[in-house]
Amino acid sequence: MRSLARSQLFTLALSVLFITSCSKTVAENPFAYPFVKQLHLKREPGKPYSGYRAFYLLTEDFEPVVESASDVESIREVLAFASSLSLKYKIPWTHFVDANALAPAFVADDQELKRACESIIGDLKAMAQNSDDCELHLHGPLNSKLLEQLKTQHKLHLPRLLNESDQAYRQRKSFFFQAFYGSGYRELVSSLAYGKGFLESVIYDAKQEVSAFRPGGWDHGADSNDTLFYFHALADAGLTANSGLSTGDFGKDNWRVGNDPGHNLATIAVDDKQMIEVSPTAGPGAYLNPVLPHDLGKLSSVVKDEMPVIVAVYHLAGLQKTNHAIEDGSQRSDAELESEREKLEQHFRNVADLTAAKVLYPITLRELLAIISGR
């Protein structure tokens, strides 16, 4: 009887464990949403890239600390290093620029900080003129002082979405949550639209458009309805592309940004408009990071009649020295920073070698979007 009871208890425990595991919420895959359709680029003869196996898109989220002039001096040194790599190895960057990082150039009371941030803008302009691309990035609503300045210069008429409601949310340290759930749809669109116009003005002198956005926190909502709201906001702000669909819970084992090569491009139907998604290539730590172990040769394996796009993600601010980090003891040592610089340059060497072997074709997001749209 005692043996039978133990057996019954064990069976009951297994049943409870099975029921519990089945009842856990499965992370939604945005690439499976009905309004998201995977896009596959067909190989075309007679193009500069026709003989290559894959496109290579190197992106970085430009979100430095800009609390003091010395912070700015440090990130400017990092930008100079990044620019030197690009020029030396002929591999351009696509910078997703956090517009709020440039705001002090226009709203800071500290004149030294203001002038220093003006210099960052000059650096980014020079890099854009040397073949780099600059697109929009935000982690929260656009700086309120900057937004008011921009509104006085050019008033936009923005839509308001009905049926806005709060709900359980998978991760709250993100642009989408802070802008949409914190302030509403109209403020979400306002940050996007004015942020887009701001970068077009200060980086491109209003001669080129900023077409793409990458959301801070890699977040586009808790479910398919949120994601559709998100893409509606991008469209209403005049943006035509996004880079950063993600699956799972931020920081958890199920966290994944983007998708595998050949599956990370998509079109998104938003009413009568069509948006383009160019997601990162998934990899260790959620996405392909140029300083973490990876095999670009394997990732670029030939897909018959298809030109896959490998999208890497880096954060140049990770090489920055800041007063705040020094004070709280979180600043990485000079040796650690130098080691990371060496890893980044080694990545550039590898890509250059694969380019010479006609495996990878380096490209910016702006150039890729032009190819996708047939321009």
For each feature predicted by the language model, list its residue ranges.
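Active-site-adjacent pocket scaffolds in enzyme catalytic domains
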Residues: 33-45, 158-160, 204-322
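A short acidic (Asp/Glu
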Residues: 69-70, 97, 104-109, 145-149, ...
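Metal-dependent polysaccharide deacetylase catalytic core of the NodB/CE4 family, i.e.
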Residues: 92, 96-224, 248-251, 311-316
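Active-site beta->alpha N-cap acidic-glycine motif
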Residues: 30-130, 308-313, 319, 351-359
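Bacterial N-terminal signal peptides that target proteins for export
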Residues: 1-10
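Well-ordered, non-membrane alpha-helical segments in soluble/globular domains
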Residues: 71-82, 110-122, 185-195, 225-233, ...
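C-terminal motif of bacterial Sec signal peptides marking the signal peptidase cleavage site
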Residues: 20-21
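Active-site and substrate-binding clefts of carbohydrate-active enzymes
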Residues: 269-290, 308-375
